[in-house]
Swiss-Prot record:
Family affiliation: Belongs to the lyase 1 family. Argininosuccinate lyase subfamily.
Lineage of source species: Bacteria, Pseudomonadati, Pseudomonadota, Alphaproteobacteria, Hyphomicrobiales
Protein name: Argininosuccinate lyase
Pathway: Amino-acid biosynthesis; L-arginine biosynthesis; L-arginine from L-ornithine and carbamoyl phosphate: step 3/3
BP-aspect Gene Ontology terms: arginine biosynthetic process via ornithine; L-arginine biosynthetic process
Gene: argH
Length: 463
């Protein structure tokens, strides 16, 4: 079937397989709202510049709003032979308003049109993601307040290292997510330039006002170079990069939840709302939500890698390869949205098992550093010497199969005669975490202050 939008040069329509590989309407239909917003701004500018007569502008504006309403009601028919959302909208507009619709594309190409649509969609999505990340931060900070004093093991190499609190652990993710929000906002600031009016690649001879269309669409300014305007997909790459880093953070937390909910750890419980059962093993409660967040992180990272590979060999300006920017970008950013919603729900649903956490915090000689610090403070011992002495004390306790706090004073003094019974005050896990009062440390009062500061900064949930 001949394509009415560009078929004049061709004696026949495309081969069926060409039509299939060429069409993007199956996925770029989600740009409909942005496409119509861009067209409304464009036609208003054409009218104000005297390029189109007022009656055509009015007809086109009314027709575009009718198309938008049809799409919203689910009545719009998306046809593959029209290739993409731009042609689909223009074709229906022509049916509604007649030949005047053909004037809409004056001083515009699909190259600058799709670049504008994509920037609008990514910008809208980044704004929504920022709000979701803030909600997850809020959930974590609220949990940190409740569990500022709940002792748990801190790990390095997935081995017990030093006691921390559950609240402190939650606040670590609040900080990571704050950086994610910064990256989303940086990406948004850089993408907020409008390519509309760059036309195919060289600009246009019509007296358009690109500053007017940029302002109408909420952009800070028009893009400065017409070639770059249509060739650039940095805005998608940067957004996918920020999304990938955020997904890595979510995946790390999801991995911890998978481990922590296992019978072997038993650190936290998730409700039925975020777990599933087994078709054969009736006892199972599987942390599927966390596992899916972990898996979707790979999908998001894959979208970034895929688009980098698409773009790496493209000469200026536009190539059809760039049509492949959409599916990965759409899927990745919407997958991240789903992951953020799931994680916020799981965090609010989490039930830490305090006794199990405390017991685990005391295992693995996690207060050994506290002993070394005590030797430095009380015996004025150089830290390297204190480290060596503490290692010998740990070895002595390990040989007896007991904890540090269970080793007798005589046993310790056999290694270092200067040790007194005052040392036992620092070997308990509560005393250990309480002593970590340095800025950013795990002391419960620190955690409460930082969590409160975050909640004040984040503000109430937006309705």
């Amino acid at each position: 079937m001949s394509n009415r939008m560009w078929g004049g040069r061709f004696a026949s329509g495309p081969a069926e397989i060409m039509e299939e590989i060429n069409a993007s309407i199956g996925f770029d239909r989600r740009l409909a709202s942005q496409d119509i917003r861009g067209s409304l701004a464009h036609v208003a500018m054409l009218g104000s510049q005297g390029i189109l007569p007022a009656e055509d502008v009015a007809a086109i504006e009314a027709g575009l709003k009718s198309v938008e309403a049809e799409i919203a009601r689910g009545e719009f028919v998306f046809r593959r032979e029209l290739e993409d959302i731009h042609m689909a909208v223009e074709s229906r507009l022509t049916e509604i308003v007649g030949p005047a619709a053909g004037r809409l594309h004056t001083a515009r190409s699909r190259n600058d049109q799709v670049a504008t649509d994509m920037r609008l969609w990514v910008r809208d999505t980044l704004d929504a993601l920022d709000a979701q990340v803030a909600d997850l931060q809020r959930a974590l900070a609220e949990t940190a307040v409740k569990h500022a004093g709940t002792v748990m093991p801190g790990f390095t190499h997935l081995q017990s290292a030093q006691p921390v609190t559950f609240g402190h652990h939650c606040l670590a993710y609040v900080e990571m997510l704050a950086r994610d929000r910064g990256r989303f906002r940086d990406a948004r600031a850089r993408l907020n330039e409008c390519p509309l009016g760059a036309a195919a690649l060289a600009g246009t001879s019509f007296p358009i006002d690109r500053h007017a269309t940029a302002a109408a669409l909420g952009f800070d300014r028009p893009t400065a170079n017409s070639l770059d305007s249509v060739a650039d997909r940095d805005f998608a790459l940067e957004s996918l990069s920020a999304a990938s880093i955020c997904a890595v953070h979510l995946s790390r937390f999801a991995e911890e939840l998978v481990v922590w909910t296992s019978a072997q750890f038993g650190f936290v419980r998730l409700s039925d709302g975020f777990t599933t059962g087994s078709s054969i093993m009736p006892q199972k409660r599987n942390p599927d939500a966390a596992e899916l967040v972990r898996a979707k992180a790979g999908r998001i990272i894959g979208a970034l890698t895929g688009l980098l590979i698409v773009m790496k060999g493209l000469p200026l300006a536009y190539s059809k390869d760039m049509q492949e920017d959409k599916e990965g970008t759409f899927d990745a950013l919407q997958s991240l949205s789903l992951c953020l919603a799931a994680m916020a729900g799981m965090v609010r649903d989490l039930e830490p098992v305090a006794e199990t956490l405390k017991r685990a915090a005391g295992s693995g000689y996690a207060t050994a550093t506290d002993l070394a610090d005590w030797l430095v403070r009380e015996l004025n011992m150089p830290f390297r010497q204190a480290h060596h002495v503490t290692g010998r004390v740990v070895a002595a306790a390990s040989e007896r199969g007991i904890g540090l706090e269970e080793l007798s004073l005589q046993g310790m003094q056999a290694i270092e005669p200067g040790i007194t019974d005052a040392v036992f005050a620092v070997l308990g896990v509560e005393n250990s975490v309480a002593s970590r009062t340095s800025y950013g440390g795990t002391a419960p009062d620190n955690v409460r202050r930082q969590a409160a500061a975050w909640l004040e900064k984040l503000g109430p949930v937006e309705k």
